[in-house]
Amino acid sequence: MDKATIKAHKINEQEYEEILKILGREPNLLELGIFSAMWSEHCSYKSSKKYLNGFPTKAPWVIQGPGENAGVIDVGGGVAAVFKMESHNHPSFIEPFQGAATGVGGILRDVFTMGARVVANMNSLRFGEVCGDSENARKQRYLLKGAVAGIGHYGNCMGIPTVGGETTFDASFNGNILVNAFALGLVKSDEIFYGKAEGIGNPVIYVGSKTGRDGLGGAVMASDSFSDANKSLRPTVQVGDPFAEKLLMEACLELFKKDYIVGIQDMGAAGLTSSSFEMAGRSGSGMKMQLDRVPMREEGMSPYELMLSESQERMLICAKKGCEQKVLEIFKKWDLDAEVIGEVTDSGQMQLYWHGELVGQIPIKPLSEAAPVLDRPTARPKYLDEIKNLQIPKDIDNKTAFLKLLRESEILNKALIYDQYDANIQTNTIKQPGYLGAAVIRIKETGKALAMAAQCDPRANFVGPKIGAARAVAAAGRKVAMSGAMPLAITDCLNYGNPQNPEVMWQFAQGCEGIKEACRELNTPVVSGNVSLYNDTDGVSVYPTPAIVSVGVNDDARANLKSVFGSAGTAIYLLGETKGEFAASLYVKALFDVVGGTLSEIDYKKERALWELVIAANKAGVLEFANSVGVGGVAMSLAKMACISGIGAECKFDVAQANFIFDESFSRALVGVTSEAKFSELAAKFGVKFEKIGVTGGDKFRLNEIDENLKEISEIYFNEFANIIKQED
């Protein structure tokens, strides 16, 4: 094998030597391509696995933790929730519509392959600077429009509601946008399917769309940095067909009602290669496949192309022997391709045939369960010492600061984005996008509700990689709790830069430690997730972005707690302590273009007590609304609540310094109290500090010296984002 071919497959010298040992010979091109895909960062997690192993993954309600297509938790009444989040960052930067659309398609397959009907989508999106007339700003607006359109197109065509998410902007994402997709499905607790291929002689069946050449090398592409030399990568981006996926989902759900199969696996990154190796690897078995039987969309396709294509809307099934015809009939009924292409063996080898000739043979274990694990060097970034002491350069009056922060893209209403998503299809949505806090859907079969919230502050993770990641877990859980639901588990999508940079690996290692700590202390285990590395262009990495989605259960769907004002005359209480913390805050970034400071540690007892107080007070019927205090502090949280509800507020907030109304002290919430005596008793019981700061009502927004007309600030809040993004329209 010549060095140029090996290099083109991103295989280094050490890895190639290992391949020679495993095979006892030189690999052919097909085998080299398979090693390249399965040992890529995207498939093998070789740089990250060392740090993921310590994640808390168990609890009485966890049915399936990491290692399967998606995580599963028991949500009561014989129902389980199946959920996961994944990235499609690199494809979305190259071709935003198809990249984002197929990201949605892939995460949907991960969920419904477990036997669940998908009932909710969410997303976590990061773009660069969108304001202004620079070439970069125009490109970022183009990327945003394309990615959002792709997400909406796929989810809407599938008939699955997109119920929430988060979108933020920062210059660190100018060279790499982040598109993280989340999906959640429901299944009976005793009807879950797994991705395994066992039982000697059991048939292996290919189902779904035909295989084409789209997406070739996608897993390897997603395991590399961008540079000027590799930006013509459109052929590596998959092309999605949501209508084909809808048929595939319905066919699979029909199949799951029968007793015909042993296991099923989505063909995602690395296509037929990853699905076959993963299924056999989990079961410790072998597999034979006749590649000439794979349904092909294009003429003249080679075994290499068939194994590594990432054409969408495809699954691999291990059926029970004798049930082949029944499986095929179901998929033919739904007008999908279905062919028996192989069988399970006890060889521990993947044997690949082409018109009867053996064209590839590789041991399965070294490419699945025993793939290489790297121990990359780490180094604490030098910049941390340079930014740790935050100095606010000068005083700015609060009215000026308020109007400046209100116009920030992070704060502005994102109706331009979420209006492209159908949030109400399936008629289960209780709280949809645009109303702050967690998204909430009902479980019709049980009368319960599921709350889910996406959260991550990249600036905080840049300033303090460990505490920032822990805060993402805690803040996502707090949003869920503010709806009245108890947070039960999380899924993560860990977006970092180039792992070959020791400072990036240090950020990643610290982020994992923060997640471990927060999940352990808050009793919200990790049940699924994804790692996306190489979010780096020309040596510049994105801010560390460990995106978290927390999922919780409210035993009574009718007792969902609003996040915005519900009526005039309700007392507004602030829960938690305001300490004047501006590290990584929007205040210093927006006003002074500074990102720095030192984050304070999380007091997990106080965080958990805040959750439990709000949940208990909601059950007691003494709350009208609850909203987590986040970016922009009390001032921005209150302003958004007023604008969305159309109800003003009269607030007086005792602070040590005037600008503390914008501080981002952690573990705080704003609640509307309908019985002050009863609420005071509960707050004392849970040991949560509280302060009455005002009352809802009127057509003004007043907070200390800020005195604004509600209609005027609402026009800014609701219209300014569209004005920014639609400049070229």
Swiss-Prot record:
Keywords: ATP-binding, Cytoplasm, Ligase, Magnesium, Metal-binding, Nucleotide-binding, Purine biosynthesis. GO terms for biological process: 'de novo' IMP biosynthetic process. Pathway: Purine metabolism; IMP biosynthesis via de novo pathway; 5-amino-1-(5-phospho-D-ribosyl)imidazole from N(2)-formyl-N(1)-(5-phospho-D-ribosyl)glycinamide: step 1/2. Mg(2+) 1 binds at E86, N530. Signal peptide: none annotated. It is an enzyme of class 6 (ligase). Its main location: cytoplasm. Its EC number is 6.3.5.3. The active site is at H42, H88. Monomer. Part of the FGAM synthase complex composed of 1 PurL, 1 PurQ and 2 PurS subunits. Belongs to the FGAMS family. This is Phosphoribosylformylglycinamidine synthase subunit PurL. The gene is purL.
